[in-house]
Amino acid sequence: LYEINGAGMLFKSNFQMLASLKAGNINQFALTDGTNHFDNKETLSTLSNLLENISATTPPIEVDRYASPTDRLLSFNILRKIRKDVTLKGNIGYSYAKSQYDYSLTRSYADADNNVIIAQEYSPLSTIHRPSIQLEYKDNSEKTYLSNTLSSTGSFLTSELPTKENGSLFNQKQTMREFYVNNKFSTLWHHKDLCWAVTSIMSYQGSPMGKITLNKETTDNVVQNANGRSF
């Protein structure tokens, strides 16, 4: 078991940068610690709602006690002073999360004639790659205020769920590719005795690939495909 944390800083008169790295296999942190500092709103696509994530029965204990994670988190935060009242902030991040475990479950049901025993074994494995970038441009001059924030996040998920039930083996596999782009613009200025303001928010969510495949020894494969987009 291991956990590694590292950070580096660079400071100049008009530029600052903070880089951080975290890696470990003790607990899961990459997806929760990879925070969007400018837009904390969580987004869930139509495709995620439709297909959801394949999952198995889990042990009745905390996830950190049975899951075997491998997490990586890399982040760069920058601040650039372009002019006296103009700044550019940025965050570039990458999260990688892998989780796997083995779990077996046996149930016994009694009726008037005999006992029915259902024995199941699960070996879930999932990996997620999640890159992200956020940029914030701000002009806070005396007569004009302008702000523009651009955020983008991608998610690349692959998961498998091999299952053995009373000696019969089948496997579910899921692949999902999604991305999200959001831009928020606002400006305010004074002209004579009037104050003018303009605000614009645009967002796009794309899910070009969503696929679930069920492989079973005794039957043909079952495949479910979906994709979607929203504005």
Regions inferred by a protein language model and the residue ranges of each:
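Flexible, solvent-exposed loop segments that connect beta-strands
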Residues: 108-117, 165-170, 216-223
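Short, tandemly repeated low-complexity microdomains enriched for cysteine and small residues
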Residues: 160-164, 212-214
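Membrane-proximal, glycine/serine-rich, low-complexity loop/turn segments characteristic
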Residues: 1-158, 172-206
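Short, intrinsically disordered, charge-balanced linker/junction segments flanking boundaries
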Residues: 102-103, 210-231
